[in-house]
C-alpha cells in the first residue's frame, strides 16, 4: 500500500564566487564561502518523485531511468539525516522508491549533481515532514547542491564549526530583486575532462600556492563586494568580480601540481571576445564565468542580450536556429537581423577555426528555488513501483 508520494523540481545554479577545496571531505565543508545565481527551471531542472510503500522491501533509486546504487555513501548520508529529523512516516521499516530525471543532457557539462541532490533532499523533506534548514543536508550529497535550495542569488557560508551546522546556504536576494538578469550558456564541444572536480579540489588544496591567500583574503573580500553589488543591482561591479574570480579559480588550477587545465582554446577565445566587446562598448555589458570545464556561463542584463547573442551567433553559427538556440524562440528574428553599431563592427569578423566549437547556446534567466508538483506529474507507477519510463 502506498503511504505517500511526492514530486518536486529543483534548479541548477552557476557560481560567480567559486567553491574549490574542502576542509572536511566526509561532510563536505568548504575552504571558502561561495555565491551563485539560480537558473530558471523553465530551461534547466531536475524532477524527482519519491514514493513510500508498505509493499517495498528495500530503498531503490533510478536516475534517468537507470537503477543506481542507493547504498553509496552520499545517498545514505542524506537518507539517514532526513529520517533522523522526520516528523512524518516515523516507522523506519517503510522503504522508498526514488525516480529522478534531468531535462538537460548530462553530457552538457552543467552541474547536474547540484540540482539532483537538492531535488532529492527537498522531496524527501516534504515526504518526511522535516522542519528547519535542509540546505546543510543537501550539502552532504554535493556541496553546491545547498545553493540550489533557494532562488535568485544564494551564498553558501563556509561556517567554522566542526559539525558543519553553520555551513549552510542563505538567500542573498530572491529572483524578483533583479528580474532582468539573464544567463547565456555556451555549451562547448569537448571530450570528458581528465581531472574530476573532487580530485582537482584535493590536489589544489594540497599544492597550489594561491589557495591560502584566496581562502583567507581574496574570497572574503569578493563575497562582501559582490553581495553589495547584487543588493544595489550594480552590474559593473558584479561583472568585474565575476570574471576576476573565474580567472583566479583557473589560475589556482594551473598552479596545482601537476597543473590542471579545464579550459580549452574555445573557452579562451570566448573570454577574449567578451573582453574585446566590453572594451569597445565602454563598459562591462556581459561577464563570463567558467566552472571546472570548458563551458562559458555568461551573466548579462536583458538590454544586452540581443546584441551579445548576435555576436555569439556570428562567431559560432549553428545549422538550425530552432535547435541550436535554446531560448525564447520569439527572440530568433531579432538576433538574426541585428545590425551592430559602427564601433562594434570590427568584432563581427570571426576566426573560422572555432565555427563548429559549440553544441548549442542556452539562454535563460535567474529563477526560483525548488517547487512542489501535483500527483499527476509523478515519475513512478504506483502499481509497479518502477519509473513510468521503464513500464
From Swiss-Prot:
Would the keyword Lipid metabolism be found if you checked this record's keyword annotation? yes
Q: Which SUPFAM superfamilies match?
A: GHMP Kinase, C-terminal domain, Ribosomal protein S5 domain 2-like
The UniProt keyword set, sorted, is: ATP-binding, Cholesterol biosynthesis, Cholesterol metabolism, Cytoplasm, Lipid biosynthesis, Lipid metabolism, Lyase, Nucleotide-binding, Steroid biosynthesis, Steroid metabolism, Sterol biosynthesis, Sterol metabolism
What are the binding positions for (R)-5-diphosphomevalonate in this chain?
Answer: 19-22, 74, 142-147, 198
| Cited Pfam families | MDD_C, MVD-like_N
The pathway this protein participates in, as annotated, is: Steroid biosynthesis; cholesterol biosynthesis
Provide the protein's localization: Cytoplasm
Biological process (GO) annotations held by this record are:
cholesterol biosynthetic process; isopentenyl diphosphate biosynthetic process, mevalonate pathway
Has UniProt tagged this entry with the keyword Lyase? yes
- What is catalyzed by this enzyme? (R)-5-diphosphomevalonate + ATP = isopentenyl diphosphate + ADP + phosphate + CO2
List the Gene Ontology MF annotations in alphabetical order. ATP binding; diphosphomevalonate decarboxylase activity
Q: Which domain of life is it from?
A: Eukaryota
E.C. number(s) listed in UniProt: 4.1.1.33
Q: Name one GO cellular component term.
A: cytosol
| Recorded family membership | Belongs to the diphosphomevalonate decarboxylase family.
Quaternary organization: Homodimer.
Query: What role is this protein assigned?
Result: Catalyzes the ATP dependent decarboxylation of (R)-5-diphosphomevalonate to form isopentenyl diphosphate (IPP). Functions in the mevalonate (MVA) pathway leading to isopentenyl diphosphate (IPP), a key precursor for the biosynthesis of isoprenoids and sterol synthesis.
| Name the record gives this protein | Diphosphomevalonate decarboxylase
Task: State the organism named in the record.
Answer: Dictyostelium discoideum
Gene that encodes the chain: mvd
